[in-house]
Curated annotation (Swiss-Prot):
Zn(2+) binds at D1831, D1834. The lineage of its organism: Eukaryota, Metazoa, Ecdysozoa, Arthropoda, Hexapoda. This is Neurexin 1. It comes from Drosophila melanogaster. Coiled coil: none annotated. Residues 1491-1527, 1747-1757 have a biased composition (Polar residues). Keywords: Cell membrane, Cell projection, Disulfide bond, EGF-like domain, Membrane, Metal-binding, Postsynaptic cell membrane, Synapse, Transmembrane, Transmembrane helix, Zinc. The gene is Nrx-1. The chain crosses the membrane at residues 1697-1717. Expressed in brain, with expression in medulla, lamina, lobula, lobula plate, mushroom body and antennal lobe, and in retina (at protein level). Expressed in rabdomere of photoreceptor cells (at protein level). It holds the Pfam family EGF.
Amino acid sequence: MKAPHSATYQDNYADAAMTARTRPSMDMDQQRNRNQAELRLLPAQRTSTSAFESPDLRFNKARRRRRSEQVPPVVVEYRRSYRVLIVSALLVSLAASFVTLSAGFQLDGSQNSFYTFRKWYTGLNGTLELEFKTEQPNGLVLYTDDGGTYDFFELKLVEGALRLRYNLGGGAQIITVGRELHDGHWHKVQVLRNDEQTSLIVDGVSQQRSTKGKEFQFGKFASNSDVYVGGMPNWYSSKLALLALPSVIFEPRFRGAIRNLVYADQPGGSTRRQEIKQQRDIKCGDVPCDHGELPARERPLRGVRGGNTTDACERNDPCQHGGICISTDSGPICECRNLEYDGQYCEKEKAPSEATFRGTQFLSYDLGQTGAEPIVSAQDAISFYFRTRQPNGLLFYTGHGTDYLNLALRDGGVSLTMGLANGKQEMHIKPSKVRFDDHQWHKVTVHRRIQEISSITSFCRLVTVVDDVYTDHSHIAGKFTMLSSSRVYVGGAVNPRALLGARVHTNFVGCLRKVEFSADTLNLNLIDLAKSGSKLIQVAGNLEYQCPSGDPQDPVTFTTRESHLVLPPWETGKQSSISFKFRTKEPNGIIVLATGSKQPRAKNPVLIAIELLNGHIYIHLDLGSGASKVRASRRRVDDGDWHDLILRRNGRDAKVSVDGVWNDFRTPGDGTILELDGHMYLGGVGPAYNSVSWPAAIWTATLRQGFVGCLRDLVLSGKAIDIAAFARVQDSASVKPSCHVQANVCNGNPCLNGGTCLEGWNRPICDCSATLYGGPTCGRELATLAFNGSQHMTIWLGNGQGTKTQTEELVIRFKTSRPAGLLLLTSAESNSPDRLEIALVAGRVRASVRLSDREKNLLAGQSVLNDNNWHTIRFSRRASNLRLQVDGAPPVRGMLSETILGRHSTMEIRSVHLGGLFHAEEEIQMTSTMPNFVGQMQGLVFNGQRYLDIVKSLGPELSALPSATFKLTARFVNSPAGQPYHAATFRSKHSYVGLAMLKAYNSISIDFRFKTVEPNGLLVFNGGRRNDFVAVELVNGHIHYTFDLGDGPVTMRDKSRIHMNDNRWHQVSIRRPGPKTHTLTVDDSFEIISLTGNNMHLELAGILYIGGVFKDMYSKLPASISSRSGFEGCLASLDLGDASPSLTSDAVVPSSLVVSGCEGPTKCSQNACANRGNCVQQWNAYACECDMTSYTGPTCYDESIAYEFGNNKGMVQYTFPENAQADTEEDNIALGFITTRPDAVLLRVESATTQDYMELEIVEGNIFMVYNIGSVDLPLGEIGTKVNDNAYHVVRFQRKGGNATLQLDDYNVQALTPQSHHSTVFNTMSNVQVGGKFSRNGRNRIERPFAGVIAGLSVNKLRILDLAVERDPHITIRGDVQLVTGVLDRNDLQRMQQTPASGYPGALDDLIFSGAGSGCRGDDEDECTPPFESGSGDDLITPVYVPPTKQTTTSQQGNSLSTGGSSSGGVITNGTERACDDEDCVHGSGDYGETTEQFTSTSTARGSESNNEMVTITTTGRSDVTTEQHQGSSSSSSSGSTPSYATTQSSSSSSSGGSAASTPGQVSTTSSVATSSTQRATSSSTSTSSSTTSTTTTTTTTQATPPPEIRSTVTERETTPYDIYIAGGGMGGSGRNDHDRMQLPDEHHPLPPLPPPIPPQDPPPYGPYGGNTYNTNMNNYRPKGKGGRINSIEEERTAMIIGIVAGILIAVVLVILLVLWLKSNGDRGYKTESEKAAAYGSHNPNAALLGNTSTNGSYHQQRQHHMHGGGGGGGAGQQQHHAQQQMHNGHNGNGNGGGGGGGGMMSSGSGSLGYGSDGRPQMAGLVQPKAKKRDSKDVKEWYV
């Protein structure tokens, strides 16, 4: 049926060519506007050489050619007008650029005129828009369908009217709109869907139709076709079954312009402007790939003029923030659809769509009341932002009938209930220590999606995400198909208690923003609709469409002693006031501190401070003339309740009120003005290195005690301050913009190792002073110093400037055997006697305090303390009050005599000495009454500073800090490591937990211990604002600490000599002791770095990830982080500043794969068995059970038996014996697989007596197990990961009764627990079907076949694939199934199959051959067009062993004429060949194509830049070959028989591609393929089944720019059209630009009738392929891009002679070497190929291991200087013919033992390929297997 069509096409083709030749030369402006890669039918369009060459350069080249050419007069005349044409073209092009400003996509209506765009996701309410312009009344505008079933959309012009024909399953509908639309003007078209309603709008005129049926989905998005504009790809002509409307292929193509194609191309995605489909979007698995689907920049756009290059939106899209650019005649405009921006270019941010709800207002719509149909969709989404202080309230409700979704705020968490069909689901997101009623904005997203599992069961996935961090997901399975919504309530309802699924009974109070409800592509912004007065939305109450930007009533919580806020200076003056509310349970803390500079006549700097001391409020006020300190509260206020404070002053007079009780006071001196020019500090004074000064009278500041509690309603001099806004932009981790109370924080005894827990404000305070441990929970070992009597430690405070204090607090622990010794001593300036001394005297502790001339001694300790045990000393001073306590004994108190508060109670401290008093410079002992200390000290805390920990973190160099300088001669003692605490095991690299944000704004303190055997993994990560982040990772067994404060990332690495992945505990400590000092300590390895940047704060945001991040986040991590997987192992003893969180109970984002405790290294450890094998402990060993791993071996590490299921359907079936059909209450199934199929059945288990079954399947790329044990279908799946990614996955399924679990790889375990009663027994398990399932109506057809690899299948410990290998009688293998090995070694993208190595002697390795698959999914390979994929150069191989055969020599019969071979590199003149210069010739390919299959198809030439391509066509019968080429006005034709040897090119030319073999009984034509570019030619081949001979033809072309059309005709009894990919050079091998021809002598075969003569035409300039077929005077043409060449005939002849001689010499040498090699290896037999043997023979000892293999570009580069011509291909082809015949060891025989391998000079064919009695090619020495259809994935390529 296709022969007449092909003939008609050929006639049309010839008519088009004839018409082209009689047309005048084409306009130059059209020529310039074409794509550089464009290939035209019209020869006149091939006149230009390269778009990169100027006209003058081309003209000068033409002048140089005249020196050696006889140019016809018509050519001279043509070139005289050439410059005129060029100038004219420039002017016309300039004018055309304005005319075609918005030309869009141009189509000329030719046979190959069409565009391909991404799939249209129609949903149930999708839209599609475009504009078109044409002058033709008929043409196909757009087409898309469901892949060939029922549904389609066809948009076409019919007699000037636009007709939409569509089918949604209920029958075709037709809508026609418009008339005379072919007027050359732009027309706008819209296709709108709304469930069953479909509308067509043209220029505002609308028509609509309704579709009848049960559902209105448009196919399935995964299998739907692309969108084709202007026409259909040609390959559909032979694949009509893939079209839902086959007649569309015969529609006339559109001729005109298309622009502004807008639609949604992803589920849930927004509409956007579409562009031509790019290469990464091309998928060739569903249908044969052809050039019509290749990207525009990599294929010649035949039939499309200029692409979209003149479209203003394409050249420069002015739209911002995702606006859709629309081209118009007046220029581009922007449509800001569904955006938060507007303006001309969508550049202005819209006012937020928000509203304030106060409990009586809400939004709603009810479609049922208006009689409208509900909104129906396959997926919907709800998203909004909310802010509230109320813990309960209805947020959103939607439903229809009994289906509902109720979203509310309950107890400060987000609560969701859903009912669908008969299933109900409920979730409550309330992370640990996190509440959402904190009056901060929170984002909520709810997404539902329905997936059809079977015809009666669907699966609804529900995902809820809060703040993009806190996630919960679940699913419901049942008999439903769609999601419906007819009612919606936002913010409340008339009676929220009556709504289905209600868990709260109150309306929402607070603010809502951007409330959006989307159903498929429908998107409703409900607040915007209400604000604009939409009739759809009903508004209850007086709704205010705005939210206050800030509220002074918003509270903040200071969570640590160091947390604080910095406010701008407070403008005070003579009168001022301050008021606020506070609450806390901690007795001490500085609340407000504001200072000013000292005035010239003032006594002191001005100051105001408010502190909480011993549970009371104290006011400090100094106007410069004297300080006053007043206690403002009469009772304690540290009771956890809110308290009000008001302070007012007028000059010196002031009064303060706490909870309404006023107290007046007056400042001393004559100062009346309070001028505060410094920052105001709230909650604390910051880290020790802050340059903040305060008087000694503010005791809490001296003791570094910040306020921990809540603060709100701050008003300064009548101005309300939104302190929550400051908290959000400053230290948001430590200062929370909310206030909540956590009671009983000491429950559960959080303090370890004997620490004492005290109730703080929402935090436990652990007193570790009586223990050997420190840290937030007394879990970390203390730093211990050892003194030997001559060692000491000295601390200079304030870098030697010293400090003045009225209070001191000291804690120190010691251990000694000496009765006396100096423990601690402070010193002041040399003229000051102030000091504090703590010493051991006679075995007791003495504290001596001296202020000026007053001194007081306290003695404590009832027993002797020099007992070499640890003792704790606590000392404190409050002005004149002293307190000393040793261990747990009652404290000793005392008071300094005759002191008053103020100057006389102030102590000057310049330095602190431990262990002894030494001179700073000379280190000689100064006069002291006490001996130096001998023993150990630890746990020193002096005025809130842990100096021993600071010194240890600074390392041995003791870098100076802004707050202190150190000198140390004592040594640190390595304390014995304690037991890890809060240990957790990360069982997978995909697991992680989330904690509250790391508190690292001013300082960093991170400690943890870890143990692992994995060398890499992310341990800690916290992102931040801008580029700030902090991360800790394990890289190659070493710790990397990376951070960025805004000055660029900095990475610190440990310098340990050992790798940390040794399954031992390792300690990591990270500190920031100074503003620019960072330290990393890993075990004993210490690193320190000092930065020079100006940024002082680490501004983090989000949560702190421990053990990894979610998988999609790795690609977004900063480039300085190398981890791409998480941590697997044990993590413990995590201390983060003042907190020690548990990785399980305190995680705000928990993980089921992170469990408490460390599954440590016992005999049966977690690492004993690989791949999650089950370790079984035995008496003195362990064993690994591998049934649930898909692996095997003693440790579950070895690969299991694997089978590959091809595209032609196949199945492995196991039938249980009748006596073994068991009833099972538990089932365990595991397997590994690799596939790219998005929909397939991997496994099905059936019952013999009931409908029970288990089916493991892939649905839309997700893995599901659906099982039924007597009641209903129960689906269980992993939705979060796609498995059709060609990667190896392991799935494990376990069932116990009705409950089941499924785990994919190392991801979270998915569990299913049916709520209703279900049967628990699977009855009479009868058979297992692997690779698909049988259809219900019979046992012959396989439904939903699997294509890929399945390995290690275990069903209840029964390894079915192992039984298949053992040929178990209960196993049946059907169809395209074969055993494979090396599954895990495969490339990620392609497959490699290999067979066991040869057992024959002398065989070093497997032989290999390569071919190409078709990529065809059809069952019948004859329906598939040949593969036309462009290779990457790194394809895979299929090793195949070829047994040795006896070497034979067959004499050649018949005529073998080198002149009949193809030319290579040279130009054929009058039937002779000559060598080309090496500057003109470029290498090609001389490889043989592997004969694989017969195929038929028809296509039109279309080429593109690509890599190696090979197509081999096998036909039977005697063939006469006629080859005709047309280039410009030139052509050539030849016919004849070709010699029986292959041809190999010399180094100065490309390899031959046109050699053939001929005997009286057969004709064989073989050529090779080169790597450069490909071209499609329309040709015909013949085949008959009665002949016993075979003809193999391969045509190749190498090109750098688009080649001309090639007409090749093979004449035979009947004509069968077929497609040929022409890769490489011209027919018969060529260089990049040499277009070679194959000529067959006339005297051997009669010529078929030639087409009519072609009228002469002005010859064009030399095309990009060089060489004119008929013009014999153009032999010296030099391809573009090359340097100068030889111009004289004598020089060329000399070069030819030199080349011939050199070729003969090299050939002789190679022949000798080859003969010697064959003699020395006579016992070996290989199937080799000529060029491979030579190319690798001189370089690679394994040359003979290469069989018939196509090559890639790198191979050609390697070989081109090592090969010489043969077979008439090169300059020395005839001279080498005899040598080639000597090497030729066989011919293609006609019988079972047949012989000839390849030919050519370097061939050593072993006769391995012959022909059987049936005429089919057969491997000699092998028993031929049963014929099996070959599919695209049976053979892969791997170029070596």
